[in-house]
């Protein structure tokens, strides 16, 4: 992000970063990073849905224009009565995330390693993206062998077949296609997320359910 931000500034443009998935999971330094705008979402950190925040740096203040006009709330950028209870809850959620950041990050990395080690025994299971340059809690996994169908796990594991912001589309993920997958491989991809309340038992149970489904559900898998 710092490298991209520096390049953007050299061309006089503003740099916005969507930090919804990263906040509370990776270190963010707005004091040093050349970022002009950064957006956050409360529910990604166990806060309420329907509330977020936008960091506006000094370079962006004079160029940002209001889209909702009226009473001039929120520094004149977004008029309308403030949702005080949601704002307070978001602040509390972010404070808790900051307080337990190091502890939770270490736990999530340990659980992720446990999950990946066990999934490595499943033929054709592939981790999408970089193994190191990634957020720690979310995994995109493609099962390229057999007749894998994610519907086989619907009754036992909470997972996603796409990003939440793209869930209404039946088209293959353009991100997976850009990574080199074809449409069939993209359809055999699931996303698993680890969180504050995930346990080792959850990891072991999920892997066992996936293995069992591979072996006992030929109509769906192979």
Residue positions per predicted region:
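Pyridoxal 5′-phosphate
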Residues: 1-222
């Amino acid at each position: 992000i710092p490298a991209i931000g520096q390049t953007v500034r050299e061309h006089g443009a503003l740099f916005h970063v969507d930090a919804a998935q990263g906040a509370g999971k990776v270190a963010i330094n707005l004091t040093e990073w050349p970022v002009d705008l950064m957006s956050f979402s409360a529910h990604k950190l166990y806060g309420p849905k329907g509330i977020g925040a936008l960091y506006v740096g000094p370079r962006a203040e004079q160029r940002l224009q209001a889209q909702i006009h009226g009473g001039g709330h929120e520094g004149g950028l977004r008029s309308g009565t403030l949702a005080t209870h949601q704002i307070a809850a978001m602040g509390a959620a972010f404070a808790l995330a900051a307080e337990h950041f190091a502890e939770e990050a270490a736990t999530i990395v340990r659980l992720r390693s446990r999950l990946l080690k066990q999934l490595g025994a499943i033929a054709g299971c592939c981790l999408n993206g970089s193994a190191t340059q990634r957020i720690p809690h979310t995994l995109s996994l493609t099962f390229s062998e057999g007749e894998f169908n994610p519907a086989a796990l619907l009754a036992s594991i909470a997972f996603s077949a796409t990003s939440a912001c793209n869930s209404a589309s039946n088209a293959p993920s353009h991100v997976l296609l850009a990574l080199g997958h074809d449409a069939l491989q993209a359809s055999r991809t699931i996303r698993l997320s680890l969180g504050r309340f995930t346990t080792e038992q959850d990891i072991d149970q999920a892997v066992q359910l996936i293995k069992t489904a591979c072996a006992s559900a030929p109509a769906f898998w192979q």
